[in-house]
Structure formats: C-alpha cells, structure tokens
Amino acid sequence: MASLGVNIDHIANVREARKTFEPDPVKMVLLAELGGADGITVHLREDRRHIQDRDLNLLKETVHTRLNLEMAATEEMTSIALNLKPDIVTLVPEKREEVTTEGGLDVIKNKRKLKEIIQRLSGEDIPVSLFVDPVQAQLENCAEVKAAWVELHTGKYAITKKKARDLELSILKESTAKAKSYGLRVNAGHGLTYQNVEPIAAIEGIEELNIGHTIISRALSVGLSQAVKEMKSLIINPRKDNFLL
C-alpha cells in the first residue's frame, strides 16, 4: 500500500498572493497529519513564490511524520538542505516562467552535477529522490548517479483521456518495475486527483504518492483533515480500473 505525502505549497500560494501572514502552511500541517498524511512535501523555489525559508525552518521543528523538500539542483538549495536536514530531498527541474513543474529532470544531461549533489547530501544521511519522466534511459541514469529514490512523473497519465490512459498506466507500471530492478525505491506524483489516483495507487512497488493541488482544493469545501482522509481512503483501497475523467 502506498503512503500519502501531502504537498502544502498551495496554502502558501494563497498567503503570498497578499504577502501577509495567513493562511500559515506550518499551522495547516497538523490538520493534514491528523487527517492521515504520512508525510509533508514542500517545494522551496528559487524565486520563493510560495514556500519561504522561514516556513522550512518551522516545518523542520513541527512536522511529526516526515518532511520531503523538493528543490532545484543548485548550490544555494544544496546548502539549505545540508543545513536543514529534511527526511528526504527530491530534486526537480525548475523554470521561473512555469506555473508548476512541467516535466522530469534530464538526468542524462545533468549527470555529473546530480551525482555530485547526491554525494554531498547522502554523505550527511539525507536520501535523495529524482523526479523523472517514466523513461528507461532516465531510470538507468538515476541508478548510476546513486539516487536512493525516483519519483515518477504522472502528469501525462493525469491529463490523458480514456482511450490513451491504459497505455500511460502501463508505462508507469513498467517503469516502476524497471526502477526497482535497478535498486531504486519508487514514489510517484503530479496531477493526481481524487478522480484518477486509484489506478496509480494500485501499482505494485510504488511506495508513496505526493499530492497537493486537488487536496487543497477539496479542503476549501470540507476542511483539510477531511480532504486528506478522503484521499487516504482511495489510496488504501484502490480500484485498479477506477478513473472518472
């Protein structure tokens, strides 16, 4: 059974829209954990558009489950991670003009830099995950740079309509098996919703799903704890063929 990492970036988005002090993503963590979150995910972007450095420091002290820090593979972010010591770091691609992360890391192109960063973080007992597209060549290189985890990008699956979704699901299943054969542990995320999560949750070998936007959206209607509970129930007892789009 996959666990659930709740991404709270969108809570910070609301706060930063007015550059004020509320809503406070740090305070919302307790509600997410009460609802059953197995971990908390935040992305500290280079432009600080939502999560701020102060949030990170407070989250390190208040998260009772585990803290997953998403970040770009830069010297600044590596230094922050080494000082913070989150439970895991997920390296993601980042473009200032994008609304959200648009694709996976190109591990092949950035192999030397990624290997160096992974060595530095791993040397301080911080495991590293690489957010990648479900492509065999990328997975092979994830293993070669000594990543402990990969997070498979589910974005293409998430936007696919009925006729093509089985193919995307098959690719994710095959990629999970391939990653594990390379000794990698596997997470997945991006674009997952209450309507499309169950087939992904049913894939054998995926250990955690990182989900944010749909949970925060649902929380506006039912509250954060209930929104997390509803998502957790779908992940615990997934129906392999349930895709409601």
Curated annotation (Swiss-Prot):
Keyword vocabulary terms for this entry: Cytoplasm, Pyridoxine biosynthesis, Transferase
NCBIfam families: pdxJ, PRK05265.1-3, PRK05265.1-5
Listed GO MF terms: pyridoxine 5'-phosphate synthase activity
Catalytic activity: 3-amino-2-oxopropyl phosphate + 1-deoxy-D-xylulose 5-phosphate = pyridoxine 5'-phosphate + phosphate + 2 H2O + H(+)
Provenance organism: Prochlorococcus marinus (strain NATL2A)
Site location (Transition state stabilizer): E151
Pathway assigned in UniProt: Cofactor biosynthesis; pyridoxine 5'-phosphate biosynthesis; pyridoxine 5'-phosphate from D-erythrose 4-phosphate: step 5/5
HAMAP family listed in its UniProt record: PdxJ
Name of this chain's protein: Pyridoxine 5'-phosphate synthase
Active site (catalytic residues): H43, E70, H190
Function: Catalyzes the complicated ring closure reaction between the two acyclic compounds 1-deoxy-D-xylulose-5-phosphate (DXP) and 3-amino-2-oxopropyl phosphate (1-amino-acetone-3-phosphate or AAP) to form pyridoxine 5'-phosphate (PNP) and inorganic phosphate.
Predominant cellular place of this UniProt entry's protein: cytoplasm
Gene name as annotated: pdxJ
Signal peptide per UniProt: none
